Amino acid sequence: MSKINDKLTEINTVEYEVASKHSQYLFYSRFGLLDTAAYFLFLLSFFVTAVMFLVGIFHTEQFTLNDQNQGISGFYLFWNVKKPADIFNANFVYSISSFGIAILALGLFSLFLMIFLGYRWAISLFIKSQITKWERVIFSTGFYFSVVAYCFWIALMLLFLVLSDQHFFPRTTTQLKSNPNLSLFFRISHKDNVFSSRLNQLGAFATALCITLVVYELPFLGLFAFNWNKQRAKAIFCRKRKQ
């Protein structure tokens, strides 16, 4: 482990020497090229994952079962559903869709980048001397608070997709009447043999957290959109203040 840390220290030193020549760039000047690229990839992959998740959550054609359609109309986009011959007595058989697999893959990729950045930035924040004491406090507090929030939501979302298996939740109409939990985030309400889905408390919490994190990361995506250039960002900020 010490050899790995020594090697990372050597790499970081070289990166900072190069970055010092480009000090006008906001992220690159502080964290180096590798961490900046990983951070950008994380923001991008998480943003796409979160938007896809919200599209699936707010999909209007949700779980619907009644005497008229004798089947299932839509299923969130997350899963593929196999319609049984006897809809009211047979099990619902469904598997994760390509849409769900894409979210699952992006979520795992985002989680990997978050863990990687947490380790890399721990070295930069607590071992390196290129940043001041107050920068260390601000960056460490803000970043590791973000790490907990992001990882918690990604873990919830991954569990939601993985636990769609029949073994975890009931799959017949008889069972759904006594146990309305269709999945980790959704419950089933029924009236006169018409079944419809609603977000449960955990699903509502996960959705609210997802929206909050997306809004939180928008300013950071904006900084990357301006090429991380401090002078350009400062000029825009000063122009707005004068107006």
From Swiss-Prot:
Entry protein name: Uncharacterized protein MG323.1 homolog
Location in or out of the cell: Cell membrane
Taxonomic source organism: Mycoplasma pneumoniae (strain ATCC 29342 / M129 / Subtype 1) (Mycoplasmoides pneumoniae)
Transmembrane segments: 38-58, 99-119, 143-163, 204-224
Keyword Cell membrane included in the entry's annotation: yes
UniProt KW Transferase keyword: no
Membrane topology: Multi-pass membrane protein
Record key words, sorted: Cell membrane, Membrane, Transmembrane, Transmembrane helix
Signal peptide: none
Gene Ontology terms: cellular component: plasma membrane
Superkingdom of source: Bacteria
